[in-house]
Amino acid sequence: MHTHSTIVDGAPMPAAQALGLPELAAQPVLHRLQCYGELPSGLAAMLARASARLLDSDMLIRQTAQPFAAPEASAHAPMPLEHHEHALSESILGQIRLEGLAPHYKPFMRTFARILFSLFLTPDQYDRACACIDSGNNLRFLMSDAGGPTLGSWRTVAEPKDDGFKLRIDKVWGMYANLDGMAIIAARTPGSFFPSAFLVWPEQYATLQRSLCGDSFLDGVVQLGNVRGEVSVAPADRLKAGGPAALNKYLTTVRPFLVRALMAHVEWLHDQGRLRLGPDERAARDFIADAARAKTQTGTYANEDVHKVLALKFASNELLLHLVVSGAVERYADQRDLLAFTKMEGSSYRCYHELRAAARFVQN
């Protein structure tokens, strides 16, 4: 039986066509991105294809023809989340636009370390960590775990022992993790739904087993490494400022800066003739860059920002993937670099999984 909507000029107008599965699957992403403005149609279509591709068995079984409800606005006011690295970050982003990411990657990552220090370290931790960095040590931020992406399967575990913790470490794919330095290591702790983070100082880090992992990226600038071993850490070396979700807040704070850097790098590659941007790709790049800029300039943090930023990283990932698989990127090294950044600070599957888990179907 056909349905019709209103009468127009004496003739019934067909009802709007029902959404297909790809469009329905994309709603947990699109609803979050719409807070930044109207999406270009090409980007929306790209994200619909990606969402359908990323449906796992459980998601597909649970999928219905019902649309997802738009997320409700938070009843809590955003919290100020100011740090002292904004001006430096903006300066480096301008240099990336002119010269590409490779020559500015290390100083850009150092601003991330300073953001983490200023937002989530106690005053005593901050003073000691800054002194450590100022004396020539670099920070290794170790999140990816040999046990996989799910916290419950992590092999890196912090076990209470005496008046501190025994930290059993099995981390993979850490930037420069094979080199000496200090580290912030994310670990599973018994009974917690969030990972905990611990400061590991240079003399402790030097005792761990470290190995190279794969070829370097970004013109030899980025080398990954794996880390294993055990260290004892004091209670004072556990990150507590910011609450149990401190790591989530940190990633939500720095991800938009990373997305801005990636979009600036895409623009630079285009200027160098190493990447082609058609009208749809240009519109998608501009939307993502503008959205990321808007997020970095708010200076606040709200619970819903976690999902807004995950959607932004998802969009960035899918644009980079699209550029590579469509043949728009000329060189193998550039292709590999861009795909690597789709895995950094949130893969598409991880972003989509969390966005979908937070979404709810419309109730009849």
Give residue ranges: language-model regions.
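A short core secondary-structure module
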Residues: 170-207
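A glycine-rich, basic-preceded beta-loop-alpha segment at the flavin cofactor/substrate interface
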Residues: 225-260, 267-280, 291-296
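Amphipathic, small/basic residue-rich leader segments at the start of a protein or domain
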Residues: 1-108, 277-280, 295-303, 361-364
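C-terminal hydrophobic structural anchor segments
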Residues: 293-329
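A short, Trp-centered hydrophobic/proline-enriched beta-strand micro-motif
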Residues: 60-63, 113, 133-145
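Flexible, small-/acidic-enriched active-site or ligand-binding loops
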Residues: 203-237
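A gly/ser-rich beta-alpha-beta helix-loop segment of oxidoreductase catalytic cores
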Residues: 138-159
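Glycine-rich phosphate/cofactor-binding loops in nucleotide/flavin-utilizing enzymes
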Residues: 2-14, 19, 23, 320-364
